[in-house]
């Protein structure tokens, strides 16, 4: 049995996928698992240093990484669904191009999508994802790029949805799935047999959930 560190986010989909493992309902004789639960940009940055055996990362971040293998299970993608931009007032796309926009990290897929949709003339302000609605409400930024539960749980009496990047991608690609996040294994820290053993464990955890 080897000890491995597994990185994942606290959001609902990761909680669902890892519940079987975390709760002990899905057991492994191969691994003793230490969980590293952080926001996705922290996990993206940790991946560059090979600090984690297994981790969730943004699909965008994976482009810049080496010595990793994508797991067959646990990826997330959107079908006409994805990150959105919120503001306290109605803003056009042209106005957004001249705005200060809070983003949940420059390596996130959401940040890449925003640049694909608007170009690069807007000013990015990196902000922890859970603090972005508050930054918009307090006037620290003109708009905020939100991910995870904030996409559906935002207060519609306070915020306008001024750009839907899931819808934008759906139109631009004629309905292709939008790759958002993936799970990867460090080939520096694990051999192929260990990676395959974890994939089986992770699949069983998802099936249990």
Predicted feature residues:
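Pocket-lining segment of extracytoplasmic ligand-binding domains
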Residues: 128-209
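Short loop/helix-cap segments at secondary-structure boundaries that form the rim of catalytic
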Residues: 63-66, 114, 153-156
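Hydrophobic/proline-rich hinge and linker segments of small-molecule sensing/allosteric domains
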Residues: 71-93, 171-188
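N-terminal hydrophobic or amphipathic helices and topogenic motifs
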Residues: 1-76, 207-208
